[in-house]
Amino acid sequence: MFANFSSPNATGRGITGRRIAASVATAGLLVLGSLAGAGSAAADGGDVHHQGGAVATLDGLKTYDTARLDVGNGRTTNISAGLFEMSVEGGGRLQTYCIDIHNPTQNKAKYLETPWGQTSLGNNKDAGKILWILRNSYPQVGDLNALAQKSGAGQLSAKTAAAGTQVAIWRFSDGAKVEAKNRQAEKLADWLEAQAQNLQEPKTSLTLDPNAVSGKSGSKIGPVTVHTDAEKVSVAANSDATAAGIKVTDKDGQPITSVNDGTELYCDVPAGTPDGTASLTAKATTQVPVGRAFASPSKSQTQILAGSTESTISADATVNWASKGAIPSVTAEKNCSANGIDVKVSNDGDAPFTFKLGDAEHTVPAGETKTVTVPVGEDEAYDITVTGPDGFSERFQGVLDCETQGTPAPSTGGSGGTPPTSPAPSPSDTDGGTTG
């Protein structure tokens, strides 16, 4: 799921021996805070690999009708097909469709905005066609009469429009043999499938890249580039960081109060500042771009965004500094093509940095970077720790989920039996354990 995410589980040299408070009160805020004593970011089951964007909780399947899924051997099963809704942390609402038909949802599952390349969409040649469907059907097209006329469906309700849209998406996301039970919904699905064109992946709502940098005190450390679809992201350093003399600046060393897409950020650490680590947090409020993928750390079925209200988005980065010696920074990236996690260790100091990853020891010369790919099986949980001298430790946890689940084997029981791993056949279960 997306490039370069730094673990908040950093253990190292605190800026002042106490945690710098990181209170955020306004939309679009960048704050500095010590990571010393930050504790485990994965304690609640969250994936510390989130590189930025929206974080949301699944509220359930809300606007849907029925579809018929071919499960093989001449058998079909009825499944619910339509729009899910999610609540965004910090405020906002999302509407999503499923792109993982054979994997059920989990009640109140947590979801993270995720780049296509770290989901099954990354290896799907038809991923862009799904985006075309999203932009040209319900709910982006709210005039159902116009949509029905254009598609030849005759008449559509919100439920049948959502069902037809979901069915068309499944044909591209999973290669599923699926039809809408409603005749008008099926006509919409067929039209969307026939008309779909490949489009480019939409921009992220907000990320900081890279999300870990290092350097010597007495200098500007960076750059960290802002990538965002929001018009503006405000920036500020909190009071404790300001008291320590640390500033967020542009490339010319001027303090920054407002940034947008492409802005390069630097952390100006005065000479003599005790060796330490700080965090950067960018926040903004915007509509998340339609077509962004949403993946769950708990392996609930992968979703794709169909609509968004103004929502809170955020992204984090870490900054490490020292006066001399090795000055490491560590990031990790899910690499679906290599079936593993790329752990990238950079050393911006003036001495080599030796670290342990698993049972192996590696050395990064001064001014260089080393990437190690840790193999992880599909759908497997991983817990990766990088350790070094003086108690240095970075931990990365999550689940590698790069593929849709295959078609479930049909039941060997009597006629009318339900395949044991098929999507829930009853549309009455709208809070979890169901397909979209």
Regions found by a protein language model. Give the residues of each.
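Intrinsically disordered, low-complexity Pro/Gly/Ser/Thr-rich segments with frequent PxxP/GP/PP motifs
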Residues: 251-268, 360-379
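Surface-exposed, short loops/turns at beta-strand junctions within beta-sandwich domains
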Residues: 269-277, 373-383, 401
